[in-house]
């Protein structure tokens, strides 16, 4: 009798897990359908966004470029200067130092972690199983007055101080239209280590048949955040290869 109860419990647990996975996949299917279709997203070769970030009342122009082959960068325009951040050319990750304005390569660990991000163009959930990711429907949750589905996404492990750590994000999908309105994840390093980072998305608009959020915020959960307004999005932009290259003059200085 005990054996029968144990088997029944196992079957129930397995059935519940399968139903949960199917429900999470159904939510994603609705999401992709509502924003333009999975195949249309997969056909993208690149995205270029022009935006403005509001930081302490100051509007700072921001340009974001992401390409299908993994190359990407952000360009901040501040006091008439262009400051490149998070530039990845496929091998090297580098940024301009805000104080010296010189280009500096990132440490090996940061570069390896950044490389993992290239798997997520143009969307983390596309072909998630092939990437080795897992998803789980955690239930429902109200975010800023909106009822949402909470989906847990587990990506490839990150390396933090030489140790592998699970990379987990929680996505909150609006129950009415199935688009994500918030993403939460634990900060793994720096002064805010252990705190929860939250990104919010709203004002979805169509660009060449695909819907993107044109209003975003980034900050700590239940804390201050920096609003970002997208002014334009260009799909499949033409970007020169040298745009991502670590500056030659810096390379020459290292040789001398």
Task: State the predicted function of each range.
Residues 1-24:
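Bacterial Sec-dependent N-terminal signal peptides
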Residues 79, 147-244:
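Gly/Pro-enriched, hydrophobic low-complexity segments
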Residues 17, 66, 141, 173-174, ...:
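Hydrophobic alpha-helical segments, especially N-terminal targeting/anchoring helices
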Residues 64-71, 89-91, 110-111, 203-205, ...:
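A short, sequence-level motif marking secondary-structure junctions
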Residues 47, 118-122, 183-185, 199:
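Short Pro/Gly-enriched beta-strand edge/turn motifs at strand-loop
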Residues 45-47, 131, 167-169:
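A generic structural signal for short beta-strands and their flanking turns/coil linkers
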